[in-house]
């Protein structure tokens, strides 16, 4: 059994890790979830803020845990929004610390484009993007990395209450958060030994 510390209390992230290890490494996992609350890290990382926030959550988890050698891996998973000229791009950053050999690995991927093509089905998208921009302008100085206090999913859920705030991409873009994370874990597969 692989023992993991997850720098999150997200059930989606926990279940994704369990499924990925079962399917790809043919093993079961035991996961200890740790909530990392840091007022300097933005709830919604933007641009490079996702990778940096992911790194900080990993570092904070390592500092917070006693007896790390009881575990095989410490994992941090963070979604962020990259702002491009004509679209928003949701990506996943994953950082893994192999406790036994004291090495860290990272990958970014799972790209999901939020473009003007969604306007036909989601006419309130400009309002969502405007509110994200306003949140950024009001709160980005509160954080050490690029980001804001309202997540894109929370804003989507405000305008479309039937869309889950933690898995908005499944409804808007047809890609489930779980499969998005699994794709990035696949990139790290060769680094993870059991």
Task: Show which residues each predicted segment covers.
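Anionic-ligand binding patches
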Residues: 42-194
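N-terminal polybasic phosphate/anion-binding patch
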Residues: 1-71
């Amino acid at each position: 059994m692989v023992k993991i510390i997850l720098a999150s209390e997200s059930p989606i992230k926990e279940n994704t890790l369990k499924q990925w290890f079962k399917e790809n490494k043919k093993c079961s996992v035991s996961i200890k979830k740790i909530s990392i609350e840091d007022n300097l890290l933005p709830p919604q990382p933007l641009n490079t803020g996702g990778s940096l926030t992911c790194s900080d959550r990993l570092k904070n988890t390592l500092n917070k845990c006693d007896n790390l050698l009881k575990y095989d891996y410490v994992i941090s998973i963070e979604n962020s929004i990259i702002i491009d000229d004509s679209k928003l791009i949701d990506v996943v950053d994953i950082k893994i610390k192999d406790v036994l050999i004291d090495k860290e690995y990272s990958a970014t991927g799972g790209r999901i484009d939020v473009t003007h093509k969604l306007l036909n089905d989601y006419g309130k998208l400009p309002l969502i993007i405007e509110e994200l921009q306003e949140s950024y302008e009001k709160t980005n100085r509160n954080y050490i990395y690029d980001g804001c206090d309202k997540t894109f999913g929370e804003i989507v859920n405000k305008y479309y209450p039937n869309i889950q705030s933690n898995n908005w991409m499944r409804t808007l873009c047809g890609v489930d958060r779980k499969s998005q994370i699994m794709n990035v874990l696949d990139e790290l597969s060769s680094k993870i030994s059991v």
